[in-house]
Amino acid sequence: MYLENYKRFEAIIDKLREFEGAIIVEGARDEASLRKLGVRAEIIKLSRLPLPEVALIASEYDEVMILTDLDRKGEELARKLAWYLEGYGCKVDTETRRELKMIAKKDIKGIEDLYSLYLRVSLRFWPPEEGI
């Protein structure tokens, strides 16, 4: 990961930490990775519930971020979830996942890898330059 992408990655991590809605992930390891990064938002896991039920639960929040894995299956899940959630009138954030995919797809396969990537790139770019 290059310095420019590192700065964008840091901005995404900050956004995740500050997010106050619900975040939908695929499983427990995804949630664990986000918690290690300091994410305090409500996290809803897809692993045990049908998509319509997950969307109904998430629709209770003003804003919902979809963070499914960065592969084709994750893309399809994100698309379907967004459709259900928009049907409930939710504000849906799929942009964060798209941004993450653009800058980190070569480095990670899924959300469960975010924390380890964060550690690797933080060490690589330490100490930070002024203004990072």
UniProtKB/Swiss-Prot annotation:
Keyword Zinc-finger applies: no
Entry-linked HAMAP family: UPF0292
Cofactor binding note = Binds two Mg(2+) per subunit.
- Kindly provide the name given to this protein in its UniProt entry: UPF0292 protein PH1700
Q: Which GO terms describe its molecular function?
A: metal ion binding
The organism named in the record is Pyrococcus horikoshii (strain ATCC 700860 / DSM 12428 / JCM 9974 / NBRC 100139 / OT-3)
Q: Which InterPro entries match?
A: TOPRIM_dom, TOPRIM_RNase_M5-like, UPF0292
Look up keyword Magnesium and say if it applies: yes
Positions binding Mg(2+) 2 in this chain are 69, 71
Q: Which residues form the Toprim domain?
A: 20-100
Origin organism lineage = Archaea, Methanobacteriati, Methanobacteriota, Thermococci, Thermococcales
Binding residue positions for Mg(2+) 1: 26, 69
Any idea which UniProt keywords this protein has?
Magnesium, Metal-binding
CDD domains of this UniProt entry?
TOPRIM_RNase_M5_like
Please give the cofactor(s) recorded in the UniProt entry for this protein.
Mg(2+)
Q: Which family does it belong to?
A: Belongs to the UPF0292 family.
